[in-house]
């Protein structure tokens, strides 16, 4: 399988939690993609944008985008374009389920705890406020399928 350098860059941006940059990179691919691939790219884009919304305390936007992403990516399981779609979906669904249990005022604390859990930040947070929800999920990460 051959993937474009732009696709590789978008995946790297996603995995570095540069969700807005990932959106820009993959959107350029999505626009010109064959019809059969559009939903795949759009699904990954929506996971990225959902995480971006979460990072900006937009709980409703995160829930909507992650839900749309799950619907779009489910047809591409278990893997597609060298991506472990099944694992990405599991992570996105676990995050979506946790977000659906949050109140809007908990969004910032939840995001900080997710980042702390993933090692992305050293910010202090109230570790007692949402431990079960944070333990039940993680920020999605795109893994390659090993052939």
Model-derived segments and spans:
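Alpha-helical linker/edge segments of TPR/alpha-solenoid repeat scaffolds
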Residues: 51-56, 90-109
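Residue-level signature for tetratricopeptide repeat
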Residues: 12-13, 45, 52
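TPR/TPR-like (Sel1-like) alpha-helical repeat modules
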Residues: 59-77
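A hydrophobic membrane-anchoring alpha-helix module
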Residues: 99-147
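TPR/TPR-like alpha-solenoid helical repeat scaffolds
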Residues: 45-46, 78-100
